[in-house]
Swiss-Prot record:
GO function term, MF aspect, one: phosphoglycerate mutase activity
Protein name listed in UniProt: 2,3-bisphosphoglycerate-dependent phosphoglycerate mutase
Residues holding substrate: 9-16, 22-23, 61, 88-91, 99, 115-116, 159-160
N-terminal signal peptide: none
Function: Catalyzes the interconversion of 2-phosphoglycerate and 3-phosphoglycerate.
Annotated gene: gpmA
InterPro entries linked: His_Pase_superF_clade-1 (IPR013078), His_PPase_superfam (IPR029033), PG/BPGM_mutase_AS (IPR001345), Phosphogly_mut1 (IPR005952)
Amino acid sequence: MERLLVLARHGQSEWNLKNLFTGWRDPDLTEVGIAEARAAGRRLKAKGIRFDICFTSALTRAQRTAALILEELGQPDLPTIADEALNERDYGDLSGLNKDDARARWGKDQVHIWRRSYDVPPPGGESLKDTVARVLPYTMREILPRVMRGERVLVAAHGNSLRALVMVLDGLTTETIPGLELWTGVPLVYRLKADTTVESKEVLDKDA
């Protein structure tokens, strides 16, 4: 029985382009982001991958990425569940600020700690630890059981919400996970064993 789980970070958003902290704010994809999402769908199609269900966040950039991937796969009507449990990390008072402006205001070292530490939240926001505590229970309750039943699952979400899943799947530590880069529009294809450990992982980048 195939136990397929594909993780895809949304394509470039308007605020990614402007170098703004986004979090739970809701900008749309750029033209580049749309192209990235479509390319992700084509790479999945070239691998013969199809899905039984899709999970995404409550934010437009992830939902549009999911829809564009599924359109490229010829599955535009696939059941899709959107839940804020899969939302990006909440950047609190940093949300909407240019990252360079934030460094000028608080200092580059402090902003680096907020961005890349595991358990230090920005003012009014979530740490990566907080995000993991939000994402993992939902995943264990709603997503993983479907994968283990043999359903082929797509999760289109965000850099930090997906880091929570990759941390568990890849067995990464709280020291290494904050520095993990997940590229926009690049699917990670996991196949799991019966004990939920990873049988194989493939990164479908531009050369896949």
